[in-house]
């Protein structure tokens, strides 16, 4: 196993050499105020059988998880995804259906996962099951340090799992945007058997003091990044104006600072985008959102629908939808002069709810994860991307842009009193309670039977009337022919 631990201090964070003491077999960290990324890489021979048996039949597997809590991002960890569990799977052969992976995901994360598709999303507020799985499969019962280390995942802001058939290695990464309490304090020791490699990086901003540091010298290496953070005042807020009903409108509100062009090269073309992750019970109308009607687009401050994937059936109720939901990439319209625009710029996206199973109250609570909002800018010609070791890839949305595109992330800012990047909606459904008023299930069932019965009687009566009229007509004509024959005789 290989471990890579990276601490990144903010420019305003204090640092003294006594906070990092290196010896021949350990590195001691004391009260270090920094963001942290920890990455562990495993070979096949270090994994439990149920994991490597699934991986050996896979071509690629990428799992992304983000907390529902608001958290900060900073260079070089500057990318975001919507809260929840995201899975992107490429089987090794065309015959592989992903059944084994789905069973493994249920064991590792949650038994309630419905992961029939190769691309999947689920709201997963906690990684408690993952922690228990790691403690059971990777830690000895007497190894308290390993157990405690696994528990630290519960406070992580994001977790990534990656595998590809070329490297035959499973990589697990965790990110903590802030340090706990008074800072990171721990002793990172060398492995006793000297079989595990540990790399530790301490990154920060320091003022140059030595003469050789003051003199400018050309660098021999660089790390161009695709993801960049914007200033702290570049924020956005998500809401669903009441009443939501069955056709809620997702509103993204942004201050003027979010509408200013990001610090991209002058010749770059930039556009503001949002990427929505919608569970199966809520969806957009791709025919409505892909319209070129300028009046509709301008009324919602939208520019265009750029991509959609997943379930887009407009009529199916939720209980017959087999796929997890859908993803939507939309370009947002921005004012020509942001500094003279309204204090708050709102972009609205009309959505629709599917029929959910009945409940006793007549409502069901459902959660919508916040979308991410970002600027996408084309990079300069000749800029090589993808060499930054801290850049996250396979996020689900960055692959929809060209390889030379740079992203500038806006910061989600929940309203006062909210502490989650999730919106809860009360979805109206059929009531099951017998005292729920006139429109209750039994009344509707009885009314349906009565209406269908009356309709059937009306149809039978009409058919009988037609047959009676036809029979009467034939009898009359026959009688007339008989009378004519008698007169002729």
Swiss-Prot record:
Residues 1-448 are lumenal. Required for proper folding and/or the stability of a subset of proteins in the endoplasmic reticulum. Component of glycosylphosphatidylinositol-mannosyltransferase 1 which transfers the first of the 4 mannoses in the GPI-anchor precursors during GPI-anchor biosynthesis. Probably acts by stabilizing the mannosyltransferase gpi14. The chain crosses the membrane at residues 449-469. One of its GO terms (biological process) is GPI anchor biosynthetic process. Signal peptide: none annotated. Its main location: endoplasmic reticulum. GO terms for cellular component: endoplasmic reticulum membrane; glycosylphosphatidylinositol-mannosyltransferase I complex. Pathway: Glycolipid biosynthesis; glycosylphosphatidylinositol-anchor biosynthesis. InterPro entries: Pbn1, PIG-X/PBN1. Glycans are attached at residue 346. It comes from Aspergillus fumigatus (strain ATCC MYA-4609 / CBS 101355 / FGSC A1100 / Af293) (Neosartorya fumigata). Residues 470-489 are cytoplasmic. It is a single-pass type III membrane protein. The keyword Transmembrane applies. The gene is pbn1. Coiled coil: none annotated. This is Protein pbn1. It is found in: Endoplasmic reticulum membrane. SMART domains: PIG-X (SM00780). Keywords: Endoplasmic reticulum, Glycoprotein, GPI-anchor biosynthesis, Membrane, Transmembrane, Transmembrane helix. Belongs to the PIGX family.
């Amino acid at each position: 196993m290989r471990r890579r631990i990276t601490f990144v201090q903010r420019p305003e964070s204090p640092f003294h050499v006594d906070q990092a003491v290196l010896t021949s077999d350990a590195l001691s960290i004391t009260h270090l105020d920094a963001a942290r990324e920890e990455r562990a890489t495993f070979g096949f021979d270090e994994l439990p059988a149920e994991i490597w048996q699934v991986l050996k039949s896979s071509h690629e597997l990428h799992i992304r998880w983000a907390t529902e809590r608001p958290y900060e991002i900073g260079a070089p960890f500057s990318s975001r995804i919507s809260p929840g569990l995201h899975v992107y799977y490429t089987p090794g052969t065309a015959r592989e259906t992903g059944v084994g992976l789905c069973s493994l995901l249920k064991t590792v994360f949650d038994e309630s996962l419905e992961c029939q598709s190769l691309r999947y999303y689920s709201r997963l507020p906690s990684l408690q099951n993952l922690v228990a799985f790691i403690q059971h499969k990777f830690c000895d019962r007497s190894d308290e340090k390993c157990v405690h280390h696994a528990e630290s995942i519960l406070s992580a802001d994001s977790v990534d799992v990656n595998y590809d058939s070329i490297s035959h290695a499973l990589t697990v990464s965790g990110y903590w945007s802030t340090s706990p309490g008074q800072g990171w304090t721990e002793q990172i020791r060398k492995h006793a058997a000297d079989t595990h490699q540990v790399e530790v990086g301490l990154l920060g901003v320091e003022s140059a003091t030595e003469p050789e540091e003051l003199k400018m010298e050309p660098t021999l290496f660089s790390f161009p990044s695709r993801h960049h953070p914007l200033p702290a005042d570049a924020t956005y807020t998500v809401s669903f104006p009441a009443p939501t009903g069955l056709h809620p409108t997702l509103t993204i509100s942004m201050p003027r600072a979010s509408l200013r062009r990001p610090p991209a090269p002058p010749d770059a073309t930039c556009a503001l985008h949002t990427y929505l992750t919608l569970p199966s019970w809520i969806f957009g109308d791709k025919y409505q959102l892909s319209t070129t009607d300028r009046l509709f687009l301008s009324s919602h401050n939208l520019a265009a629908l750029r991509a959609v994937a997943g379930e887009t059936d407009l009529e199916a109720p939720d209980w017959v939808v087999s796929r997890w939901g859908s993803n939507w990439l939309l370009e947002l319209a921005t004012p020509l002069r942001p500094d003279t625009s309204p204090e708050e710029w709102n972009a609205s996206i009309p959505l629709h709810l599917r029929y959910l199973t009945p409940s006793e109250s007549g409502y069901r609570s459902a959660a919508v994860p916040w979308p991410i909002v970002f600027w996408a800018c084309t990079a300069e010609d000749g800029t090589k991307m993808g060499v930054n070791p801290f850049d996250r890839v396979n996020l689900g949305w960055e692959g929809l842009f060209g390889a030379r595109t740079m992203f500038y992330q806006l910061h989600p800012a929940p309203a006062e009193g909210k502490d989650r990047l999730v919106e809860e909606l009360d979805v109206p459904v059929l009531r099951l309670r017998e005292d729920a008023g006139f429109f209750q299930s039994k009344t509707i069932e009885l009314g349906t039977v009565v209406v269908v019965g009356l309709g059937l009687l009306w149809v039978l009566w009409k058919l009988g009337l037609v047959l009676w009229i036809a029979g009467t007509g034939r009898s009359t004509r026959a009688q007339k022919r008989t009378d004519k024959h008698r007169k002729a005789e």
